[in-house]
């Protein structure tokens, strides 16, 4: 594994209209980095949440990145090489369709994944997906 990830969710009890956040505390291994959003074509570390009819996603909150200099290519790109936190904000919709979907089951499953490509100073490794899921109680 190229990094360690600890996930948490702000609440496991949901009601229509409630806002939630999923936090991903990421620590790259020594000499490793992952790509941050920026002006490059590398695979950015990304939060993907499986679509649900009762869920609205906000853009992922990314912390400030560092510039990594690839000496062999004389290329500078935005990366994370130190511990950082990604936060995915979500809203449980308060619509008739959302209420109907939420009424069918409790607990409900919120699932997704963290996708990234890790590199060290010599090699970029195959893209990786780390699945995450939470059981949410509907009130």
Go through the PLM ranges and name each one.
Residues 1-139:
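Extracellular/lumen-exposed scaffold segments
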């Amino acid at each position: 594994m190229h990094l360690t990830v600890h996930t948490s969710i702000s609440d496991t009890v949901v009601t229509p209209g409630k806002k939630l956040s999923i936090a991903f505390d990421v620590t790259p291994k020594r000499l490793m980095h992952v790509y941050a959003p920026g002006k490059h074509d590398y695979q950015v570390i990304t939060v993907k949440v499986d679509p649900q009819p009762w869920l609205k996603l906000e853009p992922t909150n990314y912390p400030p990145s560092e510039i990594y200099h690839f000496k062999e290519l004389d290329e500078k790109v935005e990366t994370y090489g130190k511990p950082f936190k990604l936060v995915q904000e979500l809203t449980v919709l308060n619509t008739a369709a959302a209420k109907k979907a939420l009424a069918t089951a409790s607990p409900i499953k919120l699932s997704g994944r963290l996708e990234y490509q890790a590199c060290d100073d010599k090699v970029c490794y195959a893209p990786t997906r780390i699945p995450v899921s939470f059981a949410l109680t509907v009130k």
